[in-house]
Amino acid sequence: MKLNEIKDNEGSTHSRKRLGRGIGSGSGKTAGRGVKGQKSRSGVAINGFEGGQMPIYRRLPKRGFNNIFASDFVVVSLARIQAAIDAGKLDAKATVDAAALKAAGVIRRAKDGVRVLADGDLKAKITIVVAGASKPAVEKIEKAGGTVTLLSAPAAAE
């Protein structure tokens, strides 16, 4: 068998159905759209329109809001910090902060700061400067001989 001898399986391909090409084609005139009405016209798709029935987005109640002042922290686990130290991407002797975590590829962007959570174990003795840390995370870092410095949140604009 050669590349030029390869053929599709029988019945696997279908020729395109050409619509609106005369009465003899079998799909001329209305081209499979039926007679009159909204769906026979061009540009029919009206997003969210359910034919006059109250649409789902109006049947369901409005809930909640997006707080524009909410702090958006990047969450980092102790396990990921330890993995970066083990891989040689983070220097345990240097101060670990948002810039160091970004340079090591642990986080992509700092947003409003970094929050450390206690998921996993930490063996390295590190000095970490972050915007937030959970109490168990602080305990684990201090148990390993490290220190945690929490940055004060920026004052809200008045």
Swiss-Prot record:
Stretches of the chain forming a coiled coil according to its record: none
Listed PROSITE patterns: RIBOSOMAL_L15
Biased composition (Basic and acidic residues): 1-13
Listed GO CC annotations: cytosolic large ribosomal subunit
UniProt keyword annotations, A-Z: Ribonucleoprotein, Ribosomal protein, RNA-binding, rRNA-binding
GO term, biological process aspect, one: translation
Biased composition (Gly residues): 21-35
Stretches the record annotates as Disordered: 1-44
Gene Ontology MF annotations: rRNA binding; structural constituent of ribosome
Residues spanning the membrane: none
Family of the protein in this entry: Belongs to the universal ribosomal protein uL15 family.
UniProt subunit comment: Part of the 50S ribosomal subunit.
PANTHER family in the cross-refs: 50S RIBOSOMAL PROTEIN L15 (PTHR12934), LARGE RIBOSOMAL SUBUNIT PROTEIN UL15M (PTHR12934:SF11)
UniProt xrefs under HAMAP family: Ribosomal_uL15
NCBIfam families: rplO_bact
Biological role stated in the UniProt entry: Binds to the 23S rRNA.
Full protein name: Large ribosomal subunit protein uL15
Provenance organism: Rhizobium etli (strain ATCC 51251 / DSM 11541 / JCM 21823 / NBRC 15573 / CFN 42)
Lineage of producing organism: Bacteria, Pseudomonadati, Pseudomonadota, Alphaproteobacteria, Hyphomicrobiales
